[in-house]
Protein backbone atom coordinates (compact mmCIF):
# COMPACT_ATOMS: atom_id res chain seq x y z
CA UNK A 1 0.00 0.00 0.00
CA UNK A 2 1.25 3.48 -0.95
CA UNK A 3 0.07 6.51 1.02
CA UNK A 4 0.23 9.98 -0.54
CA UNK A 5 -0.33 13.43 0.95
CA UNK A 6 -2.11 15.83 -1.40
CA UNK A 7 -2.59 19.60 -1.36
CA UNK A 8 -6.26 20.15 -2.20
CA UNK A 9 -5.96 23.94 -2.42
CA UNK A 10 -2.97 24.47 -4.74
CA UNK A 11 -3.37 25.41 -8.40
CA UNK A 12 -5.51 27.59 -10.65
CA UNK A 13 -8.37 25.09 -10.81
CA UNK A 14 -8.30 23.79 -7.23
CA UNK A 15 -10.04 22.26 -5.43
CA UNK A 16 -12.42 20.88 -8.08
CA UNK A 17 -9.87 19.19 -10.34
CA UNK A 18 -7.93 17.86 -7.35
CA UNK A 19 -11.04 16.22 -5.90
CA UNK A 20 -11.94 14.73 -9.28
CA UNK A 21 -8.42 13.35 -9.76
CA UNK A 22 -8.23 11.96 -6.22
CA UNK A 23 -11.61 10.23 -6.60
CA UNK A 24 -10.51 8.56 -9.84
CA UNK A 25 -7.13 7.58 -8.37
CA UNK A 26 -8.55 5.72 -5.36
CA UNK A 27 -11.07 4.00 -7.62
CA UNK A 28 -8.39 2.90 -10.10
CA UNK A 29 -5.67 1.95 -7.59
CA UNK A 30 -6.86 -0.35 -4.82
CA UNK A 31 -3.45 -0.18 -3.13
CA UNK A 32 -3.49 3.63 -2.75
CA UNK A 33 -4.36 5.65 0.36
CA UNK A 34 -4.59 9.44 0.37
CA UNK A 35 -4.38 12.11 3.05
CA UNK A 36 -6.03 15.23 1.65
CA UNK A 37 -5.24 18.65 3.13
CA UNK A 38 -7.54 21.62 2.54
CA UNK A 39 -10.64 23.62 3.43
CA UNK A 40 -13.35 21.41 4.96
CA UNK A 41 -16.04 23.63 3.43
CA UNK A 42 -14.91 22.59 -0.03
CA UNK A 43 -14.39 18.88 0.65
CA UNK A 44 -17.14 16.63 -0.69
CA UNK A 45 -15.65 13.13 -1.07
CA UNK A 46 -16.47 10.03 0.94
CA UNK A 47 -14.10 7.10 0.55
CA UNK A 48 -12.58 4.70 3.06
CA UNK A 49 -9.07 5.22 1.65
CA UNK A 50 -9.23 9.03 1.72
CA UNK A 51 -8.47 10.79 5.00
CA UNK A 52 -9.29 14.50 5.08
CA UNK A 53 -7.54 17.06 7.30
CA UNK A 54 -8.74 20.63 7.56
CA UNK A 55 -6.25 23.47 7.07
CA UNK A 56 -7.11 27.07 7.92
CA UNK A 57 -4.59 28.63 5.52
CA UNK A 58 -3.67 28.48 1.84
CA UNK A 59 -0.46 29.50 0.09
CA UNK A 60 -1.34 31.71 -2.87
CA UNK A 61 0.47 31.76 -6.21
CA UNK A 62 1.69 35.31 -5.58
CA UNK A 63 3.06 34.59 -2.08
CA UNK A 64 6.80 34.89 -1.51
CA UNK A 65 7.86 31.22 -1.24
CA UNK A 66 10.11 31.05 1.84
CA UNK A 67 8.07 33.58 3.82
CA UNK A 68 4.85 31.70 3.03
CA UNK A 69 6.28 28.38 4.23
CA UNK A 70 7.52 29.96 7.46
CA UNK A 71 4.41 32.01 8.25
CA UNK A 72 1.52 29.89 6.98
CA UNK A 73 2.11 26.94 9.28
CA UNK A 74 -1.46 25.66 8.92
CA UNK A 75 -1.52 25.83 5.12
CA UNK A 76 -2.42 22.76 3.08
CA UNK A 77 1.02 22.71 1.44
CA UNK A 78 2.98 22.89 4.72
CA UNK A 79 0.85 20.21 6.40
CA UNK A 80 1.21 18.01 3.31
CA UNK A 81 5.01 18.31 3.41
CA UNK A 82 5.06 17.61 7.16
CA UNK A 83 3.20 14.34 6.54
CA UNK A 84 6.02 13.25 4.23
CA UNK A 85 8.70 14.43 6.66
CA UNK A 86 7.19 12.41 9.51
CA UNK A 87 7.02 9.28 7.38
CA UNK A 88 3.24 9.22 7.54
CA UNK A 89 3.07 9.59 3.75
CA UNK A 90 5.39 8.16 1.08
CA UNK A 91 5.15 11.23 -1.12
CA UNK A 92 3.11 14.32 -1.92
CA UNK A 93 1.49 16.13 -4.85
CA UNK A 94 0.61 19.81 -5.26
CA UNK A 95 -0.27 22.14 -8.13
CA UNK A 96 0.42 25.19 -5.99
CA UNK A 97 3.14 27.86 -5.87
CA UNK A 98 6.27 26.22 -7.38
CA UNK A 99 8.77 28.17 -5.30
CA UNK A 100 6.85 27.47 -2.10
CA UNK A 101 6.67 23.76 -2.88
CA UNK A 102 10.41 23.62 -3.55
CA UNK A 103 11.00 25.46 -0.27
CA UNK A 104 8.71 23.05 1.56
CA UNK A 105 10.57 20.16 -0.03
CA UNK A 106 13.97 21.50 0.93
CA UNK A 107 13.23 22.89 4.41
CA UNK A 108 10.50 20.51 5.62
CA UNK A 109 10.87 17.20 3.77
CA UNK A 110 14.65 17.64 3.75
CA UNK A 111 17.53 16.93 1.41
CA UNK A 112 19.16 13.50 1.19
CA UNK A 113 22.55 13.60 2.87
CA UNK A 114 25.17 13.68 0.12
CA UNK A 115 22.94 15.34 -2.47
CA UNK A 116 24.43 18.80 -3.06
CA UNK A 117 21.38 20.29 -4.75
CA UNK A 118 17.98 18.75 -5.52
CA UNK A 119 16.91 18.94 -9.17
CA UNK A 120 13.52 19.48 -10.76
CA UNK A 121 12.85 16.82 -13.39
CA UNK A 122 10.14 16.56 -16.03
CA UNK A 123 9.40 14.03 -18.77
CA UNK A 124 8.99 15.66 -22.18
CA UNK A 125 7.51 14.18 -25.37
CA UNK A 126 9.44 12.97 -28.41
CA UNK A 127 8.30 12.33 -31.96
CA UNK A 128 8.40 8.57 -31.42
CA UNK A 129 6.14 8.87 -28.37
CA UNK A 130 8.54 7.47 -25.76
CA UNK A 131 9.61 10.80 -24.20
CA UNK A 132 12.78 11.75 -22.37
CA UNK A 133 13.73 12.79 -18.83
CA UNK A 134 14.90 16.42 -18.59
CA UNK A 135 16.60 18.04 -15.59
CA UNK A 136 17.20 20.52 -13.99
CA UNK A 137 14.24 22.64 -15.13
CA UNK A 138 14.41 25.30 -12.45
CA UNK A 139 15.36 24.14 -8.96
CA UNK A 140 18.77 25.85 -9.19
CA UNK A 141 19.60 28.69 -11.59
CA UNK A 142 23.34 28.23 -11.09
CA UNK A 143 25.22 24.94 -11.16
CA UNK A 144 28.73 23.55 -11.01
CA UNK A 145 29.99 20.58 -13.07
CA UNK A 146 29.72 18.38 -9.96
CA UNK A 147 26.04 19.28 -9.69
CA UNK A 148 25.37 18.30 -13.32
CA UNK A 149 27.07 14.96 -12.70
CA UNK A 150 24.78 14.39 -9.74
CA UNK A 151 21.75 15.44 -11.80
CA UNK A 152 22.73 12.76 -14.31
CA UNK A 153 22.93 10.17 -11.52
CA UNK A 154 19.51 11.20 -10.20
CA UNK A 155 18.04 11.23 -13.71
CA UNK A 156 19.49 7.79 -14.38
CA UNK A 157 17.68 6.39 -11.33
CA UNK A 158 14.46 8.18 -12.28
CA UNK A 159 14.53 6.83 -15.85
CA UNK A 160 15.06 3.29 -14.60
CA UNK A 161 12.63 3.27 -11.67
CA UNK A 162 9.81 5.49 -12.92
CA UNK A 163 10.01 5.06 -16.69
CA UNK A 164 11.24 1.45 -16.71
CA UNK A 165 14.23 2.08 -19.01
CA UNK A 166 17.19 -0.28 -18.68
CA UNK A 167 20.62 1.36 -18.94
CA UNK A 168 19.20 4.75 -20.03
CA UNK A 169 21.22 6.89 -22.40
CA UNK A 170 22.40 10.13 -20.75
CA UNK A 171 23.10 13.30 -22.76
CA UNK A 172 24.41 16.76 -21.87
CA UNK A 173 22.60 19.75 -23.39
CA UNK A 174 25.11 21.84 -25.32
CA UNK A 175 25.52 24.12 -28.35
CA UNK A 176 27.17 21.35 -30.38
CA UNK A 177 27.74 17.61 -30.26
CA UNK A 178 31.56 17.73 -30.21
CA UNK A 179 33.18 17.11 -26.78
CA UNK A 180 35.09 20.42 -26.87
CA UNK A 181 31.98 22.53 -27.53
CA UNK A 182 30.39 24.86 -25.01
CA UNK A 183 31.43 26.95 -22.04
CA UNK A 184 33.51 26.03 -19.01
CA UNK A 185 30.49 24.46 -17.28
CA UNK A 186 29.60 22.10 -20.11
CA UNK A 187 33.21 21.21 -20.94
CA UNK A 188 34.03 20.20 -17.37
CA UNK A 189 30.66 18.50 -16.97
CA UNK A 190 31.36 16.48 -20.11
CA UNK A 191 34.63 15.26 -18.61
CA UNK A 192 32.99 14.21 -15.34
CA UNK A 193 30.11 12.45 -17.07
CA UNK A 194 32.50 10.64 -19.38
CA UNK A 195 34.53 9.43 -16.41
CA UNK A 196 31.54 8.00 -14.52
CA UNK A 197 31.32 4.48 -15.89
CA UNK A 198 28.14 3.74 -13.94
CA UNK A 199 26.34 6.00 -16.42
CA UNK A 200 25.59 5.29 -20.07
CA UNK A 201 26.78 8.74 -21.16
CA UNK A 202 26.42 9.16 -24.92
CA UNK A 203 27.71 12.74 -25.28
CA UNK A 204 26.32 16.17 -26.05
CA UNK A 205 22.92 16.89 -27.53
CA UNK A 206 21.68 20.09 -29.17
CA UNK A 207 18.35 21.74 -28.36
CA UNK A 208 17.16 21.26 -31.95
CA UNK A 209 17.27 17.45 -31.62
CA UNK A 210 15.83 17.11 -28.10
CA UNK A 211 12.55 15.70 -29.37
CA UNK A 212 14.05 13.26 -31.87
CA UNK A 213 14.00 10.42 -29.34
CA UNK A 214 17.74 9.67 -29.52
CA UNK A 215 18.35 9.79 -25.76
CA UNK A 216 16.59 8.97 -22.49
CA UNK A 217 17.93 11.60 -20.06
CA UNK A 218 19.10 15.14 -20.81
CA UNK A 219 21.04 17.11 -18.19
CA UNK A 220 21.50 20.89 -17.94
CA UNK A 221 21.58 23.68 -15.36
CA UNK A 222 18.28 25.01 -14.00
CA UNK A 223 18.49 28.38 -15.75
CA UNK A 224 18.92 26.85 -19.19
CA UNK A 225 16.49 24.02 -18.48
CA UNK A 226 13.71 26.35 -17.42
CA UNK A 227 14.10 28.49 -20.55
CA UNK A 228 14.06 25.40 -22.79
CA UNK A 229 10.96 24.06 -21.05
CA UNK A 230 9.07 27.34 -21.41
CA UNK A 231 10.16 27.65 -25.03
CA UNK A 232 8.80 24.18 -25.80
CA UNK A 233 5.53 24.99 -24.03
CA UNK A 234 5.16 28.24 -25.95
CA UNK A 235 6.06 26.67 -29.28
CA UNK A 236 3.52 23.88 -28.79
CA UNK A 237 0.76 26.40 -28.03
CA UNK A 238 1.72 28.54 -31.03
CA UNK A 239 1.72 25.57 -33.41
CA UNK A 240 -1.68 24.50 -32.09
CA UNK A 241 -3.11 27.97 -32.67
CA UNK A 242 -1.57 28.19 -36.15
CA UNK A 243 -3.06 24.82 -37.11
CA UNK A 244 -6.48 25.84 -35.82
CA UNK A 245 -6.39 29.17 -37.65
CA UNK A 246 -5.31 27.45 -40.88
CA UNK A 247 -8.06 24.82 -40.63
CA UNK A 248 -10.73 27.45 -40.00
CA UNK A 249 -9.53 29.75 -42.78
CA UNK A 250 -11.52 28.14 -45.61
CA UNK A 251 -14.22 25.57 -46.34
CA UNK A 252 -11.66 23.32 -48.04
CA UNK A 253 -9.43 23.38 -44.97
CA UNK A 254 -12.38 22.74 -42.66
CA UNK A 255 -13.21 19.59 -44.62
CA UNK A 256 -9.58 18.49 -44.47
CA UNK A 257 -9.54 19.21 -40.73
CA UNK A 258 -12.64 17.07 -40.21
CA UNK A 259 -11.01 14.19 -42.10
CA UNK A 260 -7.81 14.52 -40.06
CA UNK A 261 -9.54 15.18 -36.72
CA UNK A 262 -8.63 11.82 -35.18
CA UNK A 263 -5.01 12.05 -36.36
CA UNK A 264 -4.66 15.62 -35.08
CA UNK A 265 -6.06 14.57 -31.70
CA UNK A 266 -3.54 11.73 -31.52
CA UNK A 267 -0.74 14.15 -32.40
CA UNK A 268 -1.88 16.57 -29.68
CA UNK A 269 -1.95 13.74 -27.14
CA UNK A 270 1.57 12.65 -28.10
CA UNK A 271 2.87 16.19 -27.59
CA UNK A 272 1.04 16.75 -24.28
CA UNK A 273 3.60 16.25 -21.52
CA UNK A 274 0.85 16.24 -18.86
CA UNK A 275 0.37 12.64 -19.97
CA UNK A 276 3.63 11.87 -18.14
CA UNK A 277 2.59 13.54 -14.88
CA UNK A 278 4.14 16.50 -13.10
CA UNK A 279 7.68 17.59 -12.39
CA UNK A 280 9.48 15.87 -9.51
CA UNK A 281 11.97 17.38 -7.07
CA UNK A 282 14.67 14.72 -6.90
CA UNK A 283 17.19 14.39 -4.10
CA UNK A 284 14.82 14.78 -1.14
CA UNK A 285 13.96 12.46 1.75
CA UNK A 286 10.53 11.91 0.19
CA UNK A 287 8.81 12.12 -3.20
CA UNK A 288 7.61 15.64 -4.03
CA UNK A 289 5.61 16.00 -7.26
CA UNK A 290 4.68 19.40 -8.71
CA UNK A 291 1.63 19.30 -10.96
CA UNK A 292 1.29 22.19 -13.41
CA UNK A 293 -0.49 25.20 -11.94
CA UNK A 294 -3.13 25.10 -14.68
CA UNK A 295 -3.57 21.32 -14.48
CA UNK A 296 -6.90 19.78 -15.36
CA UNK A 297 -8.12 16.63 -13.61
CA UNK A 298 -6.34 14.37 -16.10
CA UNK A 299 -2.98 16.03 -15.55
CA UNK A 300 -3.34 15.98 -11.76
CA UNK A 301 -4.35 12.32 -11.90
CA UNK A 302 -1.17 11.61 -13.89
CA UNK A 303 0.85 13.37 -11.19
CA UNK A 304 -0.77 11.20 -8.51
CA UNK A 305 0.01 8.09 -10.53
CA UNK A 306 3.61 9.27 -10.91
CA UNK A 307 4.00 9.74 -7.14
CA UNK A 308 2.45 6.32 -6.55
CA UNK A 309 4.96 4.63 -8.86
CA UNK A 310 7.81 6.43 -7.07
CA UNK A 311 6.55 5.03 -3.78
CA UNK A 312 6.19 1.52 -5.16
CA UNK A 313 9.67 1.61 -6.68
CA UNK A 314 11.20 3.00 -3.46
CA UNK A 315 13.06 5.59 -5.52
CA UNK A 316 14.10 7.67 -2.49
CA UNK A 317 15.91 4.72 -0.90
CA UNK A 318 17.68 3.99 -4.19
CA UNK A 319 18.88 7.61 -4.39
CA UNK A 320 20.14 7.40 -0.80
CA UNK A 321 22.09 4.22 -1.51
CA UNK A 322 23.66 5.43 -4.75
CA UNK A 323 23.85 9.20 -5.09
CA UNK A 324 23.60 10.03 -1.38
CA UNK A 325 26.00 7.62 0.26
CA UNK A 326 28.50 7.78 -2.59
CA UNK A 327 28.94 11.51 -1.98
CA UNK A 328 29.22 11.57 1.81
Swiss-Prot record:
Any GO CC annotation of this UniProt entry: cytoplasm
Cysteine pairs bridged by disulfides in the record: none
NCBIfam families: plsX (TIGR00182)
Pathway linked to the protein: Lipid metabolism; phospholipid metabolism
Protein name: Phosphate acyltransferase
Keyword Cell division part of the UniProt annotation: no
GO function term, MF aspect, one: phosphate:acyl-[acyl carrier protein] acyltransferase activity
Family, per entry: Belongs to the PlsX family.
Function: Catalyzes the reversible formation of acyl-phosphate (acyl-PO(4)) from acyl-[acyl-carrier-protein] (acyl-ACP). This enzyme utilizes acyl-ACP as fatty acyl donor, but not acyl-CoA.
Major localisation: cytoplasm
EC number, UniProt record: 2.3.1.274
Keywords of the record: Cytoplasm, Lipid biosynthesis, Lipid metabolism, Phospholipid biosynthesis, Phospholipid metabolism, Transferase
Keyword Cytoplasm: yes
GO biological process terms, semicolon-separated: fatty acid biosynthetic process; phospholipid biosynthetic process
Subunit structure comment from the entry: Homodimer. Probably interacts with PlsY.
Localisation per UniProt entry: Cytoplasm
Organism of origin: Staphylococcus aureus (strain MRSA252)
Swiss-Prot/TrEMBL catalytic activity: a fatty acyl-[ACP] + phosphate = an acyl phosphate + holo-[ACP]
Amino acid sequence: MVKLAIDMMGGDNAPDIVLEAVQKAVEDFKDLEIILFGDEKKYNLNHERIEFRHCSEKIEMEDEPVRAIKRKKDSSMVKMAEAVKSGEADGCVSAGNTGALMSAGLFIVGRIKGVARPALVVTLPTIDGKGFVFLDVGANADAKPEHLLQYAQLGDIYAQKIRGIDNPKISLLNIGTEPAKGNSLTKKSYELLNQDHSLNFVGNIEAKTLMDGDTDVVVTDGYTGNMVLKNLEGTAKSIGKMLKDTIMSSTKNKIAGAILKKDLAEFAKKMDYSEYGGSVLLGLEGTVVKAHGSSNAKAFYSAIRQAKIAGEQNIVQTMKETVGESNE
